[in-house]
Regions:
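Surface-exposed, charge/polar-rich loops and edge strands
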Residues: 2-407
Length: 407
């Protein structure tokens, strides 16, 4: 068991650093894989270009990335008669709760949403006129209750042959990060997606993957680096600031995860290092370990990892035995996909079980993502970030990348 009190009492102000606005990349480079890459290996930093990553990864590595695709989650309505602007930000489906079924709906669906200017919309339907495949369609939104600071929104529309996915594609906007301090631009439609994204459901991109190009992927294949994928749908909670003084008082957001039976097998038989692309892949792979532990221990609800589960676990099960438990569970239940959720917080004091390295961007001060990086590099995050700041690296979602390796 980890020293729970020490983790609980981690002060978020200890993870602050000066980040001038001019160091926040507002747009990506024209050629994604020409960005800078910081390599952290053996406690030392060195500067490279991202396209060199196939040569920098250890031989026989398995690279695991998040195949989620960002949806056009932001909808802008106006109250009747040219009234107040009401912005609806779709977070996750409620009915149907399955992402694919909700996107395929033709007779309405319900989502959990943030609502901008909600005080000006207490009741009644909002209507939005749009065009889908050349045909006029009216989208309606109606409040159906509240959950914390979010709302249950019932969507319906006038044409029963049109899917909700088509509506979002036609009139929704890509929700770029708020810290970019700019409106969504047409270029973001392509720029804010990874080249390998194909499972729709995120409201934010797994940004470490934005640097990969078809050229980089081909070079990885030529070098014999295995490429595998998983799914974590990134929620708006990824931008949620830590408002408490200590981590123990911060509540992590819950996110949907999905892995295939073949990925579990590939992890079991990986000949070399397992490298996660992005913190979302890190959180999914490390959550898998605790799902396997729960299955092994016979828990009634093994597919949902709680925030503090890792720090309450007494230990003992190897990563291989955990993955074998998952494989057995999937085979026994005839599952090709394991679908669950995770609320895991990875902070200094966390013991990594699955990953040996990660590709990640440079994160906001006082964020849970910075805590995750610190946990992986044994507290040396500040020397890494000082190196990046001193050498002109660009920060946050559209910024440069790092490859963090353990010896």
């Amino acid at each position: 068991m980890k020293d729970m009190a020490k983790v609980y009492d981690i002060r978020i102000e200890d993870f602050n650093y000066p980040l001038p606005d001019e160091r926040i990349a507002k747009h990506p480079l024209a050629q994604r894989d020409e960005c800078k890459l910081l390599l952290y290996k053996g406690g030392e930093c060195s500067e490279h270009v991202f396209r060199e990553i196939p040569e920098l990864l250890p031989a026989d590595s398995t690279l695991v990335y998040n195949n989620t695709r960002v949806i056009n989650a932001r909808l802008r309505f106006r109250k009747p008669g040219g009234g107040a602007l009401i912005e609806i930000f779709c977070l996750e489906p409620l009915a149907p709760a399955d992402y694919a079924l909700s996107f395929a709906s033709t007779d309405g669906c319900e989502w959990l949403c943030f609502v901008g200017n909600s005080k000006r919309w207490k009741e009644g339907k909002l209507a939005l006129e749009l065009t889908v495949d050349g045909k006029p369609v009216t989208l309606y939104a109606e409040r159906n209750g509240q959950s914390g600071n979010a709302f249950r929104i019932r969507f319906s529309w006038s044409d029963g042959a049109v899917t909700f996915a088509s509506i979002l594609d036609a009139v929704g906007e890509i929700p770029i990060p708020p810290y970019l301090n700019r409106n969504t631009e047409p270029s973001d439609t392509e720029d804010y997606q990874t080249v390998y994204s194909h499972i729709e459901g995120s409201v934010a991109a797994p940004t470490a993957g934005l640097h990969f190009t078809e050229r980089t992927l081909a070079d990885l294949d030529r070098r014999g680096i295995r490429r595998r994928e998983l799914t974590l749908h990134v929620g708006a909670g990824t931008f949620q600031p830590v408002k408490s003084e200590v981590i123990g008082e911060h509540e992590m957001h819950t996110e949907f995860i999905s892995v295939t039976r073949s990925l579990v097998e590939d992890l079991l038989n990986a000949p070399g290092k397992i490298i996660a692309v992005g913190t979302t892949s890190v959180r999914t792979l490390e959550s898998l370990y605790y799902i396997g532990v729960a299955i092994h221990d016979g828990d009634e609800d093994p597919l949902h990892v709680k925030q503090w589960t890792p720090y309450n676990y007494k230990g003992g099960l190897s990563a291989k035995d955990s993955l074998k438990a998952i494989a057995g569970y999937m085979d026994a239940n005839n599952l090709t996909h394991l679908v669950g959720s995770t609320q895991i917080i990875i902070a200094p004091g966390y013991e990594f079980h699955v990953i040996d390295g990660m590709v990640t961007n440079f994160h906001q001060p006082q964020s849970t993502l910075l805590l995750l990086v610190s946990a992986f590099v044994d507290g040396n995050w500040r020397s890494i970030y000082d190196y990046a700041l001193d050498r002109g690296f660009r920060f946050l979602s559209y910024g440069d990348a790092s490859l963090l390796l353990r010896q």
